[in-house]
Amino acid sequence: MIDLTLLGCGGNVPMPNRFLSSVFINYKGRKILIDCGEGTQVSMKLKKCGFKDIDLICITHLHGDHIFGLLGLLSTIGNSGRTSDLTIVGPVGIVDCIRSMRNLVEYVPYTLKIIENPQGNFSLDNKVLRNLEISTISLEHSIECLGYSFNFRRNPKFDIDKATKNEVPKILWNKLQEGQNIVLDSKQYTPDMVLGELRKGVKISLTTDTRPIESIPDFIKDSDLFICEAMYGDDLDISKAVRNKHMTFREAANLAKLGNVKQLLLTHFSPSLDIPSMYLENATNVFENTILGEDRLSLRLNFDE
């Protein structure tokens, strides 16, 4: 299972009841943070996410409402006693941005590994996240902006009959199921000797900030959860959305429908949007399985058996 928490669902400026953009994913104790707006640490503390052992931080773009919480978080991580490497992924400019932050943070006893502007699919050189495939897409915003898709792959189902038939020692079963090749007593053992049919993973996609460009539906296709910006609830605000390169509730829902996703989570609401629920029908009339984001909303995604 995968646990996801929307730490902040606001856009532009923080509000008393709405912190800025941030999403936290916990998969088997491995932790991923997507964006880090103001208030992120407060929500993390309230939800007991933990700071020390974040494995990966992904930044969509370098507007303040998505990164102004990162400086403080890097400092807090340092003060937690962390010494292992921390990987940060982001668009063009992320290296210079992190370098500037690093100059302001007094104590960083860990190495920052930065991946700038990755294209297409990639996996991390990280044993604990080896089953995670990440994809990026260039979005249409006022500055360089990345959308992310996280595909949590599953190892194929273990086939005990196959393992027995191939006379594989039981002490090797777990490692082979994890995908390792093993030599024991001069004999080679490979994963295909114990593995059966493939199992479906879980796909989580996120796009913010952007207009609803044609490439998004294919990028988010068949996602179990699609997290999408929805800056404006009222259809009458479409001119603002076009001008500021954001989306309305209805536009986000249309992307979810075109992408054949299972569930849509709306986030990144304008400060002028006092009661987002007033406009929820603008989304549900297009895509029924729509959830309205709120700070510290938690969701659990389960793997199919």
From Swiss-Prot:
Its EC number is 3.1.26.11. The active site is at D65. The keyword Zinc applies. It holds the Pfam family Lactamase_B. Signal peptide: none annotated. Zinc phosphodiesterase, which displays some tRNA 3'-processing endonuclease activity. Probably involved in tRNA maturation, by removing a 3'-trailer from precursor tRNA. This is Ribonuclease Z.
